[in-house]
């Protein structure tokens, strides 16, 4: 994914204002029109009782990546609906969410995301998701 420095800097600035994203350790890795990659390191306090990444954080990563991907095309958005498919236990040293805009519109944007667990043996797809976002005119 090619980085566009101004776009990447803008998204990182927005990300810095989101307290939840900062608490999780979410970073914007790369951005271009319609595509964003974010990452979050594993910490034990992000896990559920079996030691896997909590499904709530899986959803948060997918929602966040999709939202940022939509922002690169239409500006300010708010999530209307999202769905998550957990494919396997999310175990890794780092989690990478890659989102893309599927269909932009004047009032809504459809996005899709894949979430990978990264560890010493590479990346494994752990979840997929889709988000429907509403365009926030004038913001």
Task: Describe these PLM feature segments.
Residues 30-32, 42, 74, 91, ...:
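Short loop/turn positions at the edges of beta-strands in beta-sheet-rich folds
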Residues 34-41, 99:
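Short, aliphatic-rich beta-strand segments
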Residues 40-42, 86, 135:
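Hydrophobic residues in beta-strands and at strand termini
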Residues 67-96, 101:
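Hydrophobic beta-strand-centered segment that forms part of the acyl-chain substrate-binding groove
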């Amino acid at each position: 994914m090619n980085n566009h420095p101004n776009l990447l800097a803008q998204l990182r600035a927005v990300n810095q204002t989101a307290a939840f994203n900062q608490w999780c350790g979410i970073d914007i890795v790369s951005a271009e029109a319609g595509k964003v990659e974010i990452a979050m390191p594993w910490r034990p306090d992000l896990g559920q009782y079996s030691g896997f990444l909590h499904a709530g954080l899986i959803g948060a990563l997918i929602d966040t990546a999709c939202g940022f991907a939509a922002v690169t095309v239409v500006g300010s958005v708010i999530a209307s609906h999202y769905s998550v498919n957990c494919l396997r236990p999310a175990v890794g040293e780092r989690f990478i969410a890659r989102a893309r805009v599927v269909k932009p519109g004047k009032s809504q944007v459809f996005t899709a995301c894949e979430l990978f667990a990264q560890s010493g043996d590479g990346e494994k797809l752990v979840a997929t998701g889709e988000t429907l976002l509403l365009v926030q005119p004038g913001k």
